[in-house]
Amino acid sequence: MGVGTKVLVITTMAICLISSAAYASEGTATFYTPPYVPSACNGYKNDGVMIAAASYAIWNNGAVCNKSFRVKCTGATNQGTPHPCRGGSVLVKIVDLCPAGCQATIDLSQEAFSQIANPDAGKIKIEFNQA
């Protein structure tokens, strides 16, 4: 592979990474606590703790089951802690449907929420995209 081709490949990869970050969706996140089974996607299978439930807004008749999403806290809602974000992001797998009355776009496991925000906030603003 020539130098010109390598530069073209690296440039294309960089553009793809930048453009995917630019298309992150915005929403809100809350959290739920164990037990995490059964789940709408996998029944009694233990999927660990880095999981989440999708709201009807992204559920798409279960098409998001077992898909991974990167979630980043972007700020506070008008509830809870004024500066809840801890920095960074978390990778979660959608394994459930957030029940009727769900107050968020994504309902994270308590463990996942705690990695990106102070749980005392209860609800946060997020950016998310499928990983």
From Swiss-Prot:
Protein's UniProt keywords contain Disulfide bond: yes
Record-annotated Expansin-like EG45 domain positions: 27-131
Keywords: Disulfide bond, Secreted, Signal
PROSITE patterns: EXPANSIN_EG45
GO cellular component: apoplast
Signal peptide start-end: 1-24
Induction: By citrus blight. Not expressed in healthy plants.
Expression sites by tissue: Expressed in the outer layer of xylem and the vascular cambial zone of roots, in shoot cambium, but not in leaves.
Chief location: secreted
UniProt cross-references to SUPFAM superfamilies, sorted A to Z: Barwin-like endoglucanases
Signal recorded as keyword: yes
Cysteines engaged in disulfide bonds, as pairs: 73-85
One GO-annotated biological process of the protein: systemic acquired resistance
Compartments in which it is found: Secreted
Further comment: Accumulation of the protein in leaf tissues indicates a systemic mobility.
Task performed by this protein: Might have a systemic role in water and solute homeostasis. Has no expansin-like activity.
Protein name: EG45-like domain containing protein
Taxonomy of the source species: Eukaryota, Viridiplantae, Streptophyta, Embryophyta, Tracheophyta
